[in-house]
Amino acid sequence: MASLDRVKVLVLGDSGVGKSSLVHLLCQNQVLGNPSWTVGCSVDVRLHEYREGTPEEKTYYIELWDVGGSVGSASSVKSTRAVFYNAVNGIILVHDLTNKKSSQNLYRWSLEALNRDLQPTGVLVTNGDYDREQFADNQIPLLVIGTKLDQIPEAKRSEVLTRTAFLAEDFNAEEINLDCTNTRCLAAGSSNAVKLSRFFDKVIEKRYSREGNLIPGFSDRKRFAGGNFKSLHYD
């Protein structure tokens, strides 16, 4: 296999929301049997067919960086975590549909990551106030994913999904709600799979295009040799 271009996507959210299970499902198409806490950052890779089924179809590596920790961590922890926010091409914000606090904390996660990207001085936001206009010029594609959909009682599902729809609107992002213990939730052709593919296409276009045309290469581009690959863990 020829070497492939890659993009870097952060996976952010509170501890316990199911980020590791989500990444495993996205990259291995399998349910993660024994999820554990992520210390530092764990990186897994997914193959993605850009514009699949069109003459522009091309295979890319999607690096998914599962960042551990709590949004309320001490400033020293945030400073350490900030190293993972460099050269980001996309962000997946993950929240637990059964935990409203994890949804609210996505605003703080986005501020932390985007401010690190927009302000290379390392200044991080410490309060939880979110102004939609604050990142109006943000060019990094976002996707909001709600986990543990299976744990939402049918009687409350409409209320919860309405709330998450407003959440995604705040980020000007599409939303996916799923059960990470069910591989069918991302089955080919499903609405979730279409949204996910559309998000990855957008990330690739932002990274490798100029005025809408894909560019052959960038001087800072990293390449991966074809063949087997495995997860990387940064502690």
Swiss-Prot record:
One function term, GO molecular function aspect: protein homodimerization activity
Annotated GO biological process: B cell differentiation; natural killer cell differentiation; regulation of protein lipidation; regulation of Ras protein signal transduction; T cell differentiation in thymus
Sequence positions that bind GTP: 16-21, 148-150, 179-180
Keyword tags: GTP-binding, Nucleotide-binding
Ranges for region Small GTPase-like: 1-235
Domain of life: Eukaryota
Cited Pfam families: Roc
Subunit structure, interactors included: Homodimer.
The family this protein is said to belong to: Belongs to the small GTPase superfamily. Rab family.
Purpose: Required for KRAS signaling regulation and modulation of cell proliferation. Regulator of KRAS prenylation, and probably prenylation of other small GTPases. Required for lymphocyte development and function. Not required for myeloid cell development.
Designated name of the protein: Rab-like protein 3
Native source species: Xenopus tropicalis (Western clawed frog)
